[in-house]
Amino acid sequence: MKTLVICSGGLDSVSLAHKMAAEHELTGLLSFDYGQRHKKELDFAQACAKRLGVPHQIIDIRTIGASLTGSALTDDVDVPDGHYAEETMKVTVVPNRNAIMLVIAFGVAAAQKADAVALAVHGGDHFIYPDCRPGFIEAFQTMQKHALDGYADVKLLAPYVHATKADIVADGAKYRTPFEATWSCYKGADRHCGRCGTCVERREAFHLAGIDDPTSYEDADFWRATTQKRNA
């Protein structure tokens, strides 16, 4: 099945790209520049495409992102420290981000005669991000069947939607994902901060999967305290 992967350059989507390359016919990686402060992630997506020998396209939607105000990922708002399961992390929501990206990706896939679009949403995202939940994935697929009716039949693949990030790490290891060549941190500095929600989740995922984390963190121990606090 000819598959186009939406790839941010993060651990989840790069692992997904390696999985799709092994299980399907990977036709390319599609990334989005929406004005995110951690734009350096796109360099890791480019490196992934080169490694897998497929085209990489970056869609510039910064003018759209500029209208989706109030998120710590795009605006001058501090990225909070802590676990994703905390209410404070809702400031990292970019309204309809996945929906917007998927609409564009399905159009690109249809134009390129691809059979599927793959997205790396997972169970750990459900608490914070509405457009990462199973209900959204199912509804979006239904909508696209109507939107492309008579023109193309493009499937939405979300193999991790019921999985944990630890499951993704295990799957990534299975498909030899070079984890050191992925970027997660929302703060976009030279090193992973180790304190933002995505850094904490990343570090915890490696621990739970029993796989060594090759990532260099500014604060390598913060995740323990915040996960213990969450589980207390």
Curated annotation (Swiss-Prot):
InterPro entries the record matches: QueC (IPR018317), Rossmann-like_a/b/a_fold (IPR014729)
A GO molecular function held by the record: ligase activity, forming carbon-nitrogen bonds
Disulfides per UniProt: none
Metabolic or biological pathway, per its Swiss-Prot or TrEMBL entry: Purine metabolism; 7-cyano-7-deazaguanine biosynthesis
One Pfam family linked to the record: QueC
GO biological process, one term: queuosine biosynthetic process
UniProt-listed CDD domains: QueC-like (cd01995)
EC number(s) reported in the record: 6.3.4.20
Protein name, UniProt field: 7-cyano-7-deazaguanine synthase
Species this protein is from: Brucella canis (strain ATCC 23365 / NCTC 10854 / RM-666)
